[in-house]
């Protein structure tokens, strides 16, 4: 399936890209080759292939959330240049 020059120009316009005439010609050839290559997938027999979302059948591997002891607050704030009421104090960025 060949991609036309006008299709490349249309996609470039949608993407707000400006190409020279030489670049449009080059992309027309390249995109046609890519589409032809991808169309080869239609030749595959997938009749007995089960649809998958992942190659490996892995499910949620996250650990359970558990509250664990943390570092001492004073130790954490020891090197903070600015602190207030046991918290880091940072410059205001939103009015």
From Swiss-Prot:
Membership in a protein family: Belongs to the GatC family.
Gene, per the UniProt record: gatC
Known role: Allows the formation of correctly charged Asn-tRNA(Asn) or Gln-tRNA(Gln) through the transamidation of misacylated Asp-tRNA(Asn) or Glu-tRNA(Gln) in organisms which lack either or both of asparaginyl-tRNA or glutaminyl-tRNA synthetases. The reaction takes place in the presence of glutamine and ATP through an activated phospho-Asp-tRNA(Asn) or phospho-Glu-tRNA(Gln).
Protein name, as recorded: Aspartyl/glutamyl-tRNA(Asn/Gln) amidotransferase subunit C
Swiss-Prot/TrEMBL GO biological process terms: glutaminyl-tRNAGln biosynthesis via transamidation; regulation of translational fidelity; translation
A Gene Ontology molecular function term of the record: glutaminyl-tRNA synthase (glutamine-hydrolyzing) activity
Keyword Ligase: yes
InterPro entries: Asp/Glu-ADT_sf_sub_c, GatC
Superkingdom per UniProt: Bacteria
Pfam families xrefs: GatC
Catalytic activity of the protein: L-glutamyl-tRNA(Gln) + L-glutamine + ATP + H2O = L-glutaminyl-tRNA(Gln) + L-glutamate + ADP + phosphate + H(+); L-aspartyl-tRNA(Asn) + L-glutamine + ATP + H2O = L-asparaginyl-tRNA(Asn) + L-glutamate + ADP + phosphate + 2 H(+)
Disulfide bonds: none
Gene3D superfamilies membership: Glu-tRNAGln amidotransferase C subunit, N-terminal domain (1.10.20.60)
PANTHER family: GLUTAMYL-TRNA(GLN) AMIDOTRANSFERASE SUBUNIT C, MITOCHONDRIAL
Alphabetically ordered keywords of this record: ATP-binding, Ligase, Nucleotide-binding, Protein biosynthesis
Membrane-crossing residue ranges in chain numbering: none
Source organism per UniProt: Thermoanaerobacter pseudethanolicus (strain ATCC 33223 / 39E) (Clostridium thermohydrosulfuricum)
Enzyme Commission (EC) number: 6.3.5.-
The keyword Ligase appears for this protein: yes
């Amino acid at each position: 399936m060949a991609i036309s020059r006008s299709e490349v120009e249309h996609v470039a316009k949608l993407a707000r890209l400006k190409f020279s005439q030489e670049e449009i010609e080059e992309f027309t050839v390249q995109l046609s080759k890519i589409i032809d290559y991808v169309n080869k997938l239609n030749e595959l027999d997938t009749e007995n292939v089960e649809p998958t979302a992942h190659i490996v059948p892995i499910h949620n591997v996250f650990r359970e959330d558990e509250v664990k002891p943390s570092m001492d607050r004073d130790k954490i704030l020891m090197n903070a240049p600015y602190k207030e009421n046991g918290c880091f104090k940072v410059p205001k960025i939103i009015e």
